């Protein structure tokens, strides 16, 4: 749940934590054995949350119940810029990489589990990470195309293994809802929805060039790589328009 000691702002009513050190917060949780659901918020996810049916089990509820919601997307940063707040992006893939590096320094005490991606992708990504961080210990991995009949076995595996870091790459909103429903199985784990990060780590896709990242244009590179996403990208201008209109009428929202 959202904790009172962390500064919480709102983006069109959706909560966001504005911290100086997200990695430090998660490092502290890992040391203390305090689990967390981490949401990497961007404008597309914000629009999906606003459009999701209200109530228990919705994307909006999953985000509201998360322990840490970080400003991942350029649209979220743009929203705070309109409000006169200087906020820096915290890309979810970079946050996950830093957490994995911390786990590699500790070793068996903080085992990792990858869930998601096409068959073979999570395994390839884990192999790359074991080369990068020889001290990193994997409790296991599973691709994201298991059948509903196979899911209980996965859940039982997580319950038995109790990994401390669980990265879920099922895409939005599926990964957020899945973590929301099942995080109680591993209460000491850091659960992070990582989208297509496994594909990048496995070498199936690439991140935008550094200059595009610095200009907050990573979304354009993703559209270039995956043109079939163009319908989903329509959420970006909608988000920008709604942000301007909302802040004009309700400056504090």
Model-derived segments and spans:
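N-terminal nucleotide/polyanion-binding subdomain common to many enzyme families
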Residues: 1-89, 93-94
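A short helix->loop->beta-strand "cap" motif at the edges of active sites that frequently abuts
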Residues: 35, 108-109, 186-189
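Short glycine-rich anion-binding loops that position phosphate/pyrophosphate groups of nucleotides
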Residues: 42-45, 75-76, 170-175, 197-198
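A short, gly/pro- and small-residue-rich
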Residues: 53, 57-65, 176-196
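A transmembrane-helix-recognition feature enriched in membrane-embedded lipid enzymes
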Residues: 77-80, 208-253
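Conserved beta-alpha
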Residues: 77-157, 161-162
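Short, flexible loop segments at boundaries between secondary-structure elements
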Residues: 143-147, 187-225
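Proline-aspartate-enriched helix->loop->beta-strand connector
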Residues: 158-172
């Amino acid at each position: 749940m959202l904790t009172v000691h962390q500064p919480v702002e709102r983006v069109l009513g959706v909560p966001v934590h504005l911290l100086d050190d997200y990695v430090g917060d998660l490092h502290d949780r890992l040391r203390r054995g305090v689990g967390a659901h981490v949401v990497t918020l961007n404008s597309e996810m914000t629009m999906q949350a606003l459009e999701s049916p209200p109530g228990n089990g919705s994307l909006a509820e999953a985000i509201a119940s998360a322990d840490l919601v970080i400003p991942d997307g350029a649209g979220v940063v743009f929203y705070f810029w309109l409000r006169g707040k200087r906020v820096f992006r915290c890309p979810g893939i970079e946050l996950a990489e830093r957490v994995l590096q911390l786990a590699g320094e500790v070793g068996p005490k903080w085992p990792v589990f990858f869930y998601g991606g096409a068959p073979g992708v999570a395994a390839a990504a884990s192999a790359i990470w074991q080369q990068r961080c020889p001290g990193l210990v994997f409790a296991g991995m599973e691709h994201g195309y298991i059948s509903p009949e196979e899911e209980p076995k996965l859940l039982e595996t997580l319950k038995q293994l109790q990994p401390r870091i669980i990265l879920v790459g099922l895409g939005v909103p599926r990964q957020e809802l899945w973590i929301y429903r099942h995080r109680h199985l591993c209460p000491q784990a850091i659960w992070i929805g990582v989208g297509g990060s496994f594909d990048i780590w496995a070498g199936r896709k690439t991140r935008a060039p550094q200059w595009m990242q610095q200009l907050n244009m990573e979304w354009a590179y993703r559209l270039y790589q995956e043109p079939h996403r163009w319908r989903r990208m329509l959420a970006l201008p909608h988000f920008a328009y709604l942000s301007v209109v909302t802040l004009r009428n309700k400056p504090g929202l």
